[in-house]
C-alpha cells in the first residue's frame, strides 16, 4: 500500500498567510508538523504534485520522474543484451505495461495513467526503439508500447489482454510463462509447485517495477 501525506490547497493569494498559520496550528494539535518541502506559488506557473506536473496546458509527468524511467529502461535493455529474447520481451513489456496481481495494479503507467500529455508516451516509445537498435537487441523481441498501454488502461482495462492480469491466468497459462520465459519444464508439476514458483516470479517483478515510482513526492 502507498500512503500519501502531501496536502494540496488551492486558495486566493491574499488568504495565504492566514491559511498557512491555521494549517500549522491544526497540525500541531494533532501532534504533527510540516517538513521543509512545503512550497507556495501562483497556480498559473504550474506545480508538481505526487510525481505529476500540472499546468494550464495539461497534466504530465514531472521531469525528474521522466528521467528516472528513461534511465531505468536503458539499464534494463543493457542488462538484457545477453539474455534470451523471450526473457527480454517479458521483462521489457512488464516495465512498459505494468500488470495486475492480487487485485492490485503495479507499474509506472498505472501510476501515471491520469496524464493528458500523450506526446510523452510517444517519446518513450521512440526511445525504446532507439535503445533496442543501439544495443543490438534481437529483432524477434516483440515489445509493447506506452501509448497503447495508456489507452488500454483508460478505456478497456477490464477486457484487455494487452496489460497482463495475472489474477486471470490459469494454471496452464502460468506453466506456459515458466516454460517460455524461464525455460523450465513444469508440464508434470502439480498446481502447488507451479503456483509457488509463479508467485515468486511475480513478487520479484513487483519489487523491480516499483523502483520506477519510489520517492515520487
Question: Predicted regions span which residues?
Answer:
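Glycine-rich, often proline-containing surface loops adjacent to acidic residues and nearby aromatics
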Residues: 1-4, 48, 101-108
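Polymerase palm active-site segment centered on the conserved acidic dipeptide of motif C
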Residues: 1-3, 9-85
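Active-site and adjacent loop segments of nucleotide-processing enzymes
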Residues: 55-217
Amino acid at each position: 500500500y502507498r500512503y500519501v501525506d502531501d496536502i494540496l490547497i488551492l486558495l486566493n493569494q491574499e488568504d495565504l498567510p492566514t491559511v498557512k498559520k491555521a494549517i500549522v496550528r491544526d497540525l500541531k494539535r494533532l501532534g504533527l508538523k510540516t517538513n521543509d518541502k512545503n512550497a507556495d506559488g501562483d497556480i498559473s506557473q504550474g506545480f508538481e504534485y505526487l510525481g505529476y506536473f500540472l499546468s494550464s496546458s495539461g497534466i504530465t509527468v514531472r521531469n525528474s520522474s521522466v528521467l528516472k524511467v528513461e534511465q531505468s529502461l536503458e539499464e534494463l535493455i543493457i542488462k538484457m543484451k545477453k539474455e534470451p529474447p523471450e526473457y527480454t520481451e517479458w521483462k521489457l513489456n512488464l516495465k512498459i505495461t505494468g500488470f495486475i496481481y492480487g487485485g492490485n495494479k503495479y507499474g509506472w503507467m498505472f501510476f501515471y495513467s491520469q496524464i493528458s500529455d500523450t506526446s510523452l508516451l510517444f517519446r518513450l516509445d521512440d526511445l525504446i526503439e532507439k535503445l533496442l537498435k543501439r544495443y543490438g537487441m534481437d529483432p524477434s523481441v516483440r515489445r509493447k508500447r506506452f501509448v497503447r498501454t495508456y489507452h488500454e488502461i483508460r478505456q478497456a482495462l477490464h477486457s484487455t489482454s494487452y496489460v497482463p492480469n495475472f489474477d486471470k491466468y490459469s494454471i496452464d497459462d502460468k506453466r506456459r510463462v515458466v516454460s517460455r520465459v524461464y525455460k523450465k519444464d513444469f508440464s508434470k508439476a502439480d498446481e502447488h509447485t507451479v503456483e509457488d514458483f509463479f508467485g515468486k516470479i511475480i513478487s520479484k517483478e513487483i519489487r523491480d517495477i516499483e523502483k520506477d515510482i519510489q520517492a515520487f513526492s
